[in-house]
């Protein structure tokens, strides 16, 4: 039975209802600082923690609850005679419930505060109390999540106590919270690219209907700190997002964020099927659609500019899963909402391209994101690309970064007309891209040509310029073919494998 509770919360959501319920059951309530004031002002009978400890709040609030009279009452095992004898001798009363939520370090670390100001939001007393309560969960109910208040109230109403299964779950939530909280603090203080221990702080954003396939369960977690596009987007219309939707949306958004120009990316199964740049939203959508009018069906379309009504009217002519953009005209949004299942996503944050992580069985691979497009760019053939061809070549390299290797993209007039990816050899990727493009002008490759066969194939389709990293021991074979066929070729010095 709960006879004594300690309440100290930053987030006061629901705390009055809980406190008044406890008071109605003759539970003695101890509290601190702002929580004490809040409860007292709202008519709850409450004891200031200073009356229990005999010590005033110290060091600008850094020391309030760090006292044996508090922690002895939390940690004492009730069926341990020696424990109970000791706390009785020391005048310590057991504390049966601890209700604490922490200083909002997750939020404050993102605000425009000084380093020292952020440090002040690292909670010490709160974590110490909830860890103690969680360790002694058989005897102490610990609440850190406002969403758990109602369930605990109902259990007490029905059974006059909280069952051990619930207590254990609540204790587990403490250590789950603390691992995320401590991870955020650790990463803030260390600022190391590859620390000795990789601690990640993510919170469940939503449960998903299923994973990549219907037989796989899934959930979506977002970072507790930092501003990221796939964390802060807003769904303005449509069904709930799926696992595949979020993965695809991430790549589509990253692709359009590569460009300063107005850009559109159509994407299916995590692979771009049409990408274009131009002067207007309507133009780039039309060009992206024309890249592959078959594959775009059931896919995702992303823009890096506000969507207008005219473009929206064209978007709803075909079946799409998602339209994502930094904003939508009011008229455009009304048009898109006529498709009730179409997910319309407003994404204002630019792609951060921070770190890439890939889980393997028993480990996580961590690497810098592929942020470097070019390094030592040089023309290696007798012929140089024209300015227009060079612009298309650079465009092609920005696109090919997001195509699974081996990857080839064929470009014409700011359109990725042919995309060949996911092939186990480069010539197959080239043939696929060239065949899809039909009449492309330039070609971009994510990695070097191991032989001269790609250049030979490109020549058959009338390609005028090629861009690739270079670095093969047989580079001269490709250079020779290009010189013989009148093709210009540029080496970038940067490979863009994507697996």
From Swiss-Prot:
* Chemical reaction(s) catalysed: (6R)-10-formyltetrahydrofolate + 5-amino-1-(5-phospho-beta-D-ribosyl)imidazole-4-carboxamide = 5-formamido-1-(5-phospho-D-ribosyl)imidazole-4-carboxamide + (6S)-5,6,7,8-tetrahydrofolate; IMP + H2O = 5-formamido-1-(5-phospho-D-ribosyl)imidazole-4-carboxamide
Give the record's GO biological process terms: 'de novo' IMP biosynthetic process
Q: Gene3D superfamilies from the xrefs?
A: 3.40.140.20, Methylglyoxal synthase-like domain (3.40.50.1380)
Q: What is its EC number?
A: 2.1.2.3, 3.5.4.10
Q: What are the record's GO terms for cellular component?
A: cytosol
Keyword annotations for this protein?
Hydrolase, Multifunctional enzyme, Purine biosynthesis, Transferase
Q: Which domain of life is it from?
A: Bacteria
> Annotated Gene Ontology MF terms?
IMP cyclohydrolase activity; phosphoribosylaminoimidazolecarboxamide formyltransferase activity
Q: Which residues cross the membrane?
A: none
According to the entry, every stretch annotated as the MGS-like domain falls at 1-144
| Biological pathway | Purine metabolism; IMP biosynthesis via de novo pathway; 5-formamido-1-(5-phospho-D-ribosyl)imidazole-4-carboxamide from 5-amino-1-(5-phospho-D-ribosyl)imidazole-4-carboxamide (10-formyl THF route): step 1/1; Purine metabolism; IMP biosynthesis via de novo pathway; IMP from 5-formamido-1-(5-phospho-D-ribosyl)imidazole-4-carboxamide: step 1/1
Task: List, alphabetically, the PANTHER family matched.
Answer: BIFUNCTIONAL PURINE BIOSYNTHESIS PROTEIN ATIC (PTHR11692:SF0), BIFUNCTIONAL PURINE BIOSYNTHESIS PROTEIN PURH (PTHR11692)
Give the protein family: Belongs to the PurH family.
**Domain remarks in the Swiss-Prot or TrEMBL record:** The IMP cyclohydrolase activity resides in the N-terminal region.
Return the protein name.
Bifunctional purine biosynthesis protein PurH
């Amino acid at each position: 039975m709960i006879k004594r509770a300690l309440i100290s919360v930053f987030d006061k959501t629901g705390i009055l209802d809980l406190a008044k319920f406890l008071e109605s059951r003759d539970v003695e309530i101890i509290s601190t600082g702002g929580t004490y004031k809040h409860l007292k002002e709202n008519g709850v009978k409450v004891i200031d923690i200073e009356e229990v400890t005999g010590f005033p709040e110290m060091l600008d609030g850094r020391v309030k609850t760090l006292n044996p009279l508090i922690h002895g009452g939390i940690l004492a095992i009730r069926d341990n005679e020696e424990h109970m004898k000791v706390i009785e001798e020391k005048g310590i009363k057991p504390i049966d419930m601890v209700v604490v939520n922490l200083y909002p370090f997750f939020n404050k670390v993102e605000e425009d505060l000084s380093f020292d100001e952020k440090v002040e939001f690292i909670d010490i007393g709160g974590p110490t109390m909830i860890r103690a309560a969680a360790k002694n969960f058989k005897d102490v109910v610990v609440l850190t999540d406002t969403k758990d208040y109602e369930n605990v109230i109902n259990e007490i109403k029905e059974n006059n106590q909280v069952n051990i299964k619930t207590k254990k779950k609540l204790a587990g939530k403490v250590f789950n919270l603390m691992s995320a909280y401590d991870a955020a603090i650790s990463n803030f203080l260390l600022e190391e690219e590859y620390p000795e221990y990789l601690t990640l702080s993510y919170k469940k954003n939503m449960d998903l209907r299923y994973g990549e396939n219907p037989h796989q369960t899934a959930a979506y977690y977002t970072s507790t700190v930092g501003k990221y596009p796939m964390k802060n987007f807003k769904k303005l219309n449509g069904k709930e997002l799926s696992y595949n939707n979020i993965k695809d949306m991430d790549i589509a958004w990253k692709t359009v964020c590569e460009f300063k120009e107005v850009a559109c990316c159509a994407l299916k199964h995590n692979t771009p099927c049409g990408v274009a740049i131009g002067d207007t939203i309507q133009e780039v959508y039309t060009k992206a659609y024309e890249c592959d009018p078959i594959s775009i069906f059931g896919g995702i379309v992303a823009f890096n500019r506000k969507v207008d009504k005219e473009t929206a009217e064209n978007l709803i002519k075909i079946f799409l899963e998602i339209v994502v953009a930094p904003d939508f005209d009011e008229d455009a949004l009304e048009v898109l909402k006529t498709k009730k299942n179409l997910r319309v996503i407003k994404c204002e944050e630019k792609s951060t391209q921070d770190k890439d992580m890939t889980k393997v069985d028993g480990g996580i691979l961590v690497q810098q994101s592929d942020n470097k497009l070019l390094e030592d760019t040089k023309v290696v053939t007798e012929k140089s690309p024209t300015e227009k061809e060079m612009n298309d070549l650079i465009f092609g390299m920005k696109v090919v970064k997001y195509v699974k290797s081996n990857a080839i993209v064929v470009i014409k007039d700011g359109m990725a007309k042919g995309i060949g990816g996911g092939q186990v050899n480069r010539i197959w990727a080239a043939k696929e891209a060239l065949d899809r493009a039909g009449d492309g002008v330039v070609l971009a490759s994510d990695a070097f040509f191991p032989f001269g066969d790609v250049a030979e194939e490109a020549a058959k389709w009338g390609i005028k310029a090629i861009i690739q990293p270079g670095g093969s021991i047989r580079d001269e074979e490709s250079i020779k073919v290009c010189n013989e066929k009148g093709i210009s070729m540029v080496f970038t010095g940067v490979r863009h494998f994507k697996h």
